Amino acid sequence: MSHNTFGHLFRVTTWGESHGPALGCVVDGCPPGLRFKLEDLQVWLDKRKPGQSRFVTQRREDDLVKVLSGVMLDADGETMTTTGTPISMLIENTDQRSKDYGEIARQFRPGHADYTYDLKYGIRDYRGGGRSSARETAARVAAGGIARLVVPGVTVRGALVQIGKHKIDRRAWDWDQVGQNPFFSPDAAIVPVWEEYLDGIRKNGSSIGAVVEVIAEGVPAGLGAPIYSKLDQDIASLLMSINAVKGVEIGNGFAAAETSGEDNADEMRMGNDGVPIFLSNNAGGILGGISTGQPVVARFAVKPTSSILTERQSIDADGKNVDVRTKGRHDPCVGIRAVPIGEAMVACAIADHYLRDRGQTGRLK
């Protein structure tokens, strides 16, 4: 299986499976001289790890990251400095239950990658989905922690803005609320609504989709290039690579189809300090594939996980019709833990474009 690497200068290769002994990543192209502590990475993995509320999978993983290479340890025994060589990171799997998947060893779960993996490769890891499992994204979040160190002054934050048909009130957006509830919601009022709604979903053994929004602030103007190296193109590509993602939009996205040219174009004026001021940000901080200096705004939709208790029709590897019921521990709404994953992907895209821009223009933004 190829294509386990993304990025141009800031390159990330992930490895490992859901029920293997461990998974991890190698980050190549990270500049030397960046200083950090393990806790600077662990905070993002703790945000993604399973088992933190009744609304996510009850698989218990500590997701403790180990940095194996690419750094030198300071005298304090905690601070690490990147050397510019590949940074290898490892996360152990400790709570696999492969026996839960014995019945589907030869059955294709509807809506999963089982059929297409088997069709393409002639073999698949049925234990939790192998590489197609969202367990792989723990390694991406670790890589995203490194990416956040690359571009000075950039803050990447995400929030859950919709579960099923229940949307947040955007007028109530408060970043301080995001870390205060199990949904990463910026709207405190929607939390009890989501709790009641998801409790019903869980009780029925079903699942539901969601929308995640990621905003990157402090992004330097000038990142990205026209035509085939657009910043929004690469952000969309990385977000689409996340498990269960079925749609991505930048800025106003699909809502722009209902907007007039007068309302959609972001008008500009010159500020008193000689720096242009945008009067709106419908473009999501990117014009012509190049960052404007405004916040970069992206949203992505995740489908309901196909791992549900309802019996469904499918086929098996012998071409026979079968009825499949998925066992195991699964997220009733994968959008919750997709928040830190989306943050990591956007951070990696921005870090890569920052290094590419520096190499092409020589500018240190």
From Swiss-Prot:
Kindly give the Pfam families that the UniProt entry links to this protein: Chorismate_synt
Top-level taxon = Bacteria
The UniProt entry, under CDD domains, shows: Chorismate_synthase (cd07304)
On subunit structure and binding partners, the annotation says:
Homotetramer.
Binding positions (NADP(+)):
R48, R54
Positions contributing to FMN binding: R131, S132, S133, N243, A244, G288, K303, P304, T305, S306, S307, R329
Give the record's family classification: Belongs to the chorismate synthase family.
What role is this protein assigned? This reaction introduces a second double bond into the aromatic ring system.
Q: Could you identify this protein by its name?
A: Chorismate synthase
Textual note on the cofactor? Reduced FMN (FMNH(2)).
Cofactors, names only: FMNH2
The protein's organism comes out as Rhizobium leguminosarum bv. trifolii (strain WSM2304)
| Keywords on record | Amino-acid biosynthesis, Aromatic amino acid biosynthesis, FAD, Flavoprotein, FMN, Lyase, NADP
KW NADP (keyword) present:
yes
Query: What's a single GO MF annotation on this record?
Result: FMN binding
Q: What is the lineage of its organism?
A: Bacteria, Pseudomonadati, Pseudomonadota, Alphaproteobacteria, Hyphomicrobiales
Q: Which GO terms describe its cellular component?
A: cytosol
According to its UniProt entry, one GO biological process term is:
amino acid biosynthetic process
> Which major enzyme category is it?
lyase
